[in-house]
Amino acid sequence: MSSSLFSYVVLLIFLFTIPYIQSQPTAPAPTTEKSPINLTAILEAGHQFTTLIQLLNTTQVGFQVSVQLNSSDQGMTIFAPTDNAFNKLKPGTLNSLTYQQQIQLMLYHIIPKYYSLSDLLLASNPVRTQATGQDGGVFGLNFTGQAQSNQVNVSTGVVETRINNALRQQFPLAVYVVDSVLLPEELFGTKTTPTGAPAPKSSTSSSDADSPAADDEHKSAGSSVKRTSLGIVVSFALFCCSVIYIA
């Protein structure tokens, strides 16, 4: 009898506590905040990108990358030339560029979309960069290689280099190491001479004096003078002979 009463009491307690338990708010699941991606920290970890970091800072392109990375759903692909790549440039190459051209050079190393190495081989050349459209230029990159070996080359029309290891290859950012600075054809291509430009003219006196036609004219004039003088001498001699004969 006592055991039945005890069971009945336990059942009542259970029935009364169920509504209370159901009314309690469910604790929210812990949220994982996505930390912003720091491009400078990624490059510093590579230990060979001092010049690139300096250019990204002075041109403010590094700040632009940070903003876009944390606001775009397309991701981004960056090609990072090593310090040795910059050292291979002709002396004064960077200093010869204007501030705007330095910005274009940095933007040329950035594709506004995330690409894995295999994706680059499937991309339609030329692939647009962040510099595309500036000053009406194409500023595109061309990719070739072999999918089997995962080897990819990038060409600008001025230089071609192999894409080496990745400092990062996880959406939304891929950072690939390159051993040459990607020089855009719009800034470093062969400059042609404007058509229709008049050829330089030399002075008339010197050209006339040195030309074969001028020499012929001088010779012709000299011959004419000689023939005239000879005719006068012959005529005078005949005149003298006729006077002597009459006398």
Swiss-Prot record:
Residues spanning the signal sequence: 1-23
Gene source species: Arabidopsis thaliana
Question: By which gene is this protein encoded?
Answer: FLA6
At which residues is glycosylation annotated? Answer: 38, 57, 70, 142, 153
Q: Which purpose does this protein serve, as stated in its record?
A: May be a cell surface adhesion protein.
Pfam families hit by this protein: Fasciclin (PF02469)
InterPro entries named among the record's database cross-references: FAS1_dom_sf (IPR036378), FAS1_domain (IPR000782), FLA_A (IPR045003)
**Annotated family:** Belongs to the fasciclin-like AGP family.
Spell out the Gene3D superfamilies in the cross-references: FAS1 domain
According to the UniProt entry, the coiled-coil residues are none
Q: Where is this region: Disordered?
A: 192-221
Q: Where is the FAS1 domain?
A: 36-182
Q: What is its main location?
A: membrane
Q: One GO cellular component term, please give it.
A: plasma membrane
Compositionally biased tracts (Low complexity): 192-212
Classification via PANTHER family: FASCICLIN-LIKE ARABINOGALACTAN PROTEIN (PTHR32077), FASCICLIN-LIKE ARABINOGALACTAN PROTEIN 13-RELATED (PTHR32077:SF54)
Residues with lipidation of kind GPI-anchor amidated glycine: 222
Q: Which UniProt keywords apply?
A: Cell membrane, Glycoprotein, GPI-anchor, Lipoprotein, Membrane, Proteoglycan, Signal
Q: Does the keyword Glycoprotein apply?
A: yes
In terms of PROSITE patterns, this protein maps to:
FAS1
- Residues forming the propeptide are 223-247
Q: What is this protein called?
A: Fasciclin-like arabinogalactan protein 6
Q: Where in the cell is it found?
A: Cell membrane
Q: How does it sit in the membrane?
A: Lipid-anchor; GPI-anchor
Keyword Cell membrane among record annotations: yes
Native organism taxonomy? Eukaryota, Viridiplantae, Streptophyta, Embryophyta, Tracheophyta
